[in-house]
Curated annotation (Swiss-Prot):
InterPro entries: DUF4533. This is Uncharacterized protein C12orf60. Residues 162-183 are annotated as: Disordered. Pfam families: DUF4533 (PF15047). PANTHER family: CHROMOSOME 12 OPEN READING FRAME 60. Disulfide bonds: none annotated. Residues 162-174 have a biased composition (Basic and acidic residues).
């Protein structure tokens, strides 16, 4: 086999592993975001459950469902805020307490209660910023057009749990567990068949090119989710500190 063919085969193997770990990372990040969102918005959205025998189509559909549920909650809460602004609610609440009592401790307690709920509009602002949820839905819809939806996660890569238990994701990517030659050949063949293009003279290269494109498209989605989580956590922390004073 030529060095070029070997290089293309290695590219396909590496792209398949990267896809596998991207899916795992996405599931983890989305569940973190979902938990944070549910607590902040006083709602309940089911977390993702991804297994090695999960179909890629089911995984992306779960993601889309979560984003749509979040958007629905955000839209409903945003409409409510538009009708009765937070500033008015704060002013009215504080004026009411002042009128009823001049007790400093009572005023302090009232302020804490106001700030406890003040982070909700911040969550809405973060998710509405640059149409994050809409952009994520659009990116996922684009990814679902690729011909890998009927594959299972294990078709891309299979971890040796015992061998990998104490290894980080990045280390796993660099140092994969020893796979049998038969399994490797089966994986390559399956990916080549699914990702092949018409009249391709080099199916391995074509498959590697397309899978690398898919992995590249997943990167920004993961980055957006991580930034959204960081921003939400930071803003919630600020308001928590304010409410504790």
């Amino acid at each position: 086999m030529s060095s070029e063919s070997e290089k293309d085969k290695e590219r396909l193997i590496q792209a398949a592993k990267m896809f596998f770990f991207h899916v795992q990372d996405l599931a983890s990040v989305i569940n973190t975001l979902t938990e944070l969102f549910s607590r902040s918005m006083n709602t309940q959205i089911l977390l993702m459950a991804v297994k090695n025998n999960s179909y890629i189509k089911d995984f992306f559909e779960q993601m889309l469902k979560i984003f749509k549920e979040m958007q629905s909650v955000v839209d409903a809460r945003h409409d409510k805020i538009q009708k009765e602004s937070l500033c008015s609610k704060v002013a009215m609440a504080m004026c009411s307490v002042v009128q009823k009592s001049t007790n400093v401790e009572e005023l302090h307690q009232s302020a804490k209660e106001v700030f406890k709920s003040a982070h909700t509009p911040v969550i809405i602002s973060v998710l509405n910023s640059s149409n994050i949820l809409g952009s994520l839905e659009s990116s996922l819809s684009h990814l679902m057009k690729f011909p890998i939806m009927n594959l299972q996660l294990s078709d891309f890569y299979t971890e040796d749990t015992k061998e990998q238990s104490d290894v980080t994701t990045s280390e796993r990517t660099r140092s994969p567990p020893g796979s049998s030659k038969t399994t490797m050949i089966d994986t390559l063949k399956k990916l080549q068949d699914v990702l092949k293009t018409e009249d391709s003279k080099n199916p391995t290269k074509s498959a590697a090119d397309l899978l690398e494109q898919i992995v590249k498209a997943m990167g920004p989605i993961l980055e957006i989710l991580q930034k959204a989580i960081k921003t939400m956590e930071m803003n919630i922390s600020v308001f928590k500190k304010a409410s504790d004073k």
